[in-house]
Every structure is written in C-alpha cells, then in structure tokens.
Amino acid sequence: KLNAPPGLAPEELTLFTRQILRQKYVDADIGITGVNFLLADIGAVAVTENEGNARLCTSFPKTHIAITGIEKILPSVNDLALFWPLLATHGSGQHITVYNTIFSGARKENEIDGPEDMYVILLDNGRTNILADVTARESMFCIRCGACLNVCPVFKNIGGHTYKATYGGPIGSVITPYLSGLKSYKHLSYASSLCGACTQVCPVHINLHELLLYNRNKSVKAHCGSRSEKIGWLLWKKACLSRAMMNMTNGRIKNFMIKLLFRKSWGDNRSLPDFAPKTFNELWKATEQ
C-alpha cells in the first residue's frame, strides 16, 4: 500500500514509515490530539506521551483540536507534579514520560511557533450519568493509566477487542454501561472474577470490583436480563447444587452442551474452555478407593 521495497529490515521499515508520516504532519491543515488533564486555574490542557506525535500534531498544522472528556479537570497546574509521574509509573513503569506539554491556546501575534487556532472539545457522552450516581461517581477519578487492565485475568485471556467498546478491562466494564446503555453492555460487569486485583493496583483508589458488583445489581433491578437467560441460570443453579447432576455426564457431553448453549453469547473471538473428563469429586472418590 505504501510501496515499500521488499526485504526491508524492521529498522528500515521504521525509517521508511517515518518519512511518509513526517510529510503528512507537515502537510496537514488540522492536528487532533487527546488530553490527559485539563488545568482549571490557567485554562490549559496537558498532554503526556513517549513518542512526540502529539507535539508534531500541534506544531506543523495551522489548527489544533483537542478532544477530551469532561472528567479530566485538575484544579491547578501544580497538581501535575503529582499526576504526571503517577500516570507514567502506573501506565508504563517510568518515573516520567518523555514528552510533557501544556497547551494554553493558539500562538500570539509576536510568537513564531504553535497553531494559529486552537479548539477544545469537551465530551459528555454519558459522563454526567455517572457523575449523577453517587456510588458510581468515583469511576470518573480514572486517569487512564491502564494498570487495572494489566493485572486483570479476564482481560489477559480475552484481550481488549472482545469487549467491543471504547474502554476495555475493569474500568471499561464499569463505565461502558453508563456511556452506552446498561441493557446493551450489562454483560461486561459479569466479565470479572472479582479477585480485586484491579482495585489493589489503581493509583487513585477506585473500588473497581465493588462497582462491578454494583452494576450487576443495577442490571438485575432494571430487569435487563431476558426470560431465556433467567431460565438458563435457574437450571444452572439447580445443576450446581446437585452433586448427582454434576456427575451425571462426562466431560465430552458437557463440552457439547456448553458449546450448543453459549457459543453465540460467548462470541467468536475466543474458544470456550473445555471441561475435564472427570470432575474433582469423581477423582477424589477414585483416590479414596
């Protein structure tokens, strides 16, 4: 697609791509960046990065558009002394990221660099729904470091694309039902072992596993589940409470039934886990004999 010569080494491919992208930055009329923090006292946006692409986006184009959620406001620029290292340490294990920039507007008449125009777009997209909920409000403390994703056993196994949402991992499972609808995304709150590892590593002390339970409770009270789902879980409960029913069939039949019932809801991104040929109870009885 880019007409790269065949047989290039990884380093050569990097240089080849860099030349193409650098020209695109130079020719662009508009540069769009995200925002890590909004600074209320000086009316500025703070961006932290390791590659320097955000600086390129704001240096060459005539117009800089910064897009951010409304929850990223810090009271003072002095708070960056805490939050920039906090984000770097929990996000990538660094003391501080390589490039840290504060943008306070378009360039003045006597300045020679920076964009001629700057626009900041504040996104709500359901965030006020979260802020209105006293219990769920603490999820808006998130600084997007990704620490909860790195320790989550579910995220490690299914990956980010399986969530089919803007935000994945534990924090995504907490906030997505508010941002995109509880009925459509209630299942994300069940994609958790409730081990609490996400809560332990969160730098801003969000009780993520408790908020996942809270979302589950809300979905039940809102009657978001279908009738077939309720019947299915009732049968599952009866089977799990009966040792005779648990030992009734072997692993092969259980695998067939689970794939038949849950293949569609499980999705195509991951294969269903297999049952062991014998249950632990059966193996224990065989050992006792």
Language-model-derived ranges and their functions:
Residues 253-289:
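Short linear elements at protein peripheries
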Residues 142, 146-149:
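Phosphate-binding glycine-rich loops and their immediate beta-loop-alpha structural context
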Residues 41, 150, 200:
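Short alpha-helical basic/polar micro-motif
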Residues 68, 144, 203-204:
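Small/polar loops that bind or transfer phosphate-bearing groups
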Residues 1-134:
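The feature marks the mature, well-folded catalytic cores of soluble enzymes
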Residues 110-139, 154-262:
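Ferredoxin-type iron-sulfur electron-transfer modules in oxidoreductases and energy-metabolism complexes
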Residues 9-10, 76, 95, 101, ...:
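Secondary-structure junction/capping motif
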Residues 75-78, 91-96, 150-153, 157, ...:
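Acidic/polar loop patches that form or flank catalytic/metal-binding clefts of enzymes
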